[in-house]
């Protein structure tokens, strides 16, 4: 299990990538680039054929990964390869619930432990239905990351009271994706979550520019960035796949990732 130290001058930067997009071995290099760019932790997404919470950018990434035969077991093992290849920041498996159900629970958590994965985030599992999975995470030393969306104060309080690692604060309802602006109500919602949470609060769903990062960092402890980074991978995929241009493409990706970065310390 992991915790994030709150240091006033530092901000949390949690990037998301899809396992196996564009290729598994490149995912490892992308993870290392994100670590170099200042990532506090990494969300490693398991590609899924029916990703209800994801917009078109991540849907396309899932399709590319699935076309390369990526699945939940291979994604977990890919996380283990990242650890063996110098990724020391926490790796959080981001997966829909159905792939977890298809594995025996003991087998699933044994795989997470064997591959030194640190956390689990299940976006389509409502808080009220997550008790069993949270208990299993505690039993196996895995940090369960909770999502909180705009809802009643009493429900926010229930979610934040049991939160571990950090709270993933959903900036807007609907699917993930790049957004140019956020509703005015987001500010009061984030302040409300932050006021109730004993762990850092990171805002995600739609963060796509350094200006938005600055705005969210004033309200919360940091940001989760997915679609913007996955879109950059999509733009660079041909250069990433070709050995002769890979190093240059990784440098371009790292430079782009740094525009979202803080320097939150992990303990």
Swiss-Prot record:
- State the active site: 43 (proton acceptor), 54 (proton acceptor)
Q: Which reaction does it catalyse?
A: (1S,2R)-1-C-(indol-3-yl)glycerol 3-phosphate + L-serine = D-glyceraldehyde 3-phosphate + L-tryptophan + H2O
Q: What's in the keyword line of the UniProt record? A: Amino-acid biosynthesis, Aromatic amino acid biosynthesis, Lyase, Tryptophan biosynthesis
- Would you name any one GO CC term? cytosol
* Pfam families in alphabetical order: Trp_syntA
Question: Which InterPro entries does the protein's record reference?
Answer: Aldolase_TIM (IPR013785), RibuloseP-bd_barrel (IPR011060), Trp_synthase_alpha_AS (IPR018204), Trp_synthase_suA (IPR002028)
Q: In which pathway does it act?
A: Amino-acid biosynthesis; L-tryptophan biosynthesis; L-tryptophan from chorismate: step 5/5
- Superkingdom, natural source: Bacteria
Q: Which GO terms describe its molecular function?
A: tryptophan synthase activity
Enzyme Commission code(s) on record:
4.2.1.20
- Family the entry assigns: Belongs to the TrpA family.
Q: What biological function has been recorded for the protein in this entry? A: The alpha subunit is responsible for the aldol cleavage of indoleglycerol phosphate to indole and glyceraldehyde 3-phosphate.
* Assembly description: Tetramer of two alpha and two beta chains.
What is the name listed in the Swiss-Prot or TrEMBL entry for this protein? Answer: Tryptophan synthase alpha chain
Its lineage reads: Bacteria, Bacillati, Bacillota, Bacilli, Bacillales
